[in-house]
């Protein structure tokens, strides 16, 4: 057991992408830079753990505020009882944010606790969840916010250069022709395509039948 001594937010910003790239134009109104939000948990034994919350990319001050809301309910409690601390966070946030912003923050704090516990026990974090039968995990490239074929080819070329064999693209039902083209184009690079139907951007939500029809 090691009690939680302090919880704080760390916000970091850096240059990101090209100002004319479709992803920057569509998703980053402040231009080609990106912010990430981290939670730092300090245990009474002096060990610090870190976890990232994706909310920090888009609403860093909101992320910081939710961390500050939750921190007093966790400080002084056992940082090794991660499930109990997760339930504490749910009791604080579930009523007003069962999904969305608070979930990003809850996740970041939970990751930080896992990091701190694994460092204290001097073992890889995955061993806290049981052992592993694999010594490596295949990575994939995440992209596909492309308005032109040239942008898609640019991303495929980069993945090929890096030796990455899987490429996740984003799509909505109206993108069917673009998706069909990239599936065919990716074969030239021996790259497999995964399709993210962007459910978080769909209003109204895309139902399962629509997704199945899209795949067919």
Where is each model-derived feature located?
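Metal-dependent enolase-superfamily TIM-barrel catalytic cores that perform enediolate-based chemistry
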Residues: 130-216
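Glycine-rich, aromatic-flanked loop segments that form ligand/cofactor-binding clefts
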Residues: 106, 110-146
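Structured beta-strand/loop patches that form or line metal/cofactor-binding pockets in enzymes
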Residues: 1-45, 54
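Conserved active-site and cofactor/substrate-binding residues in soluble primary-metabolism enzymes
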Residues: 33-34, 61, 65, 80, ...
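Metal- or metallocofactor-binding catalytic centers and their adjacent structured scaffolds
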Residues: 42-120
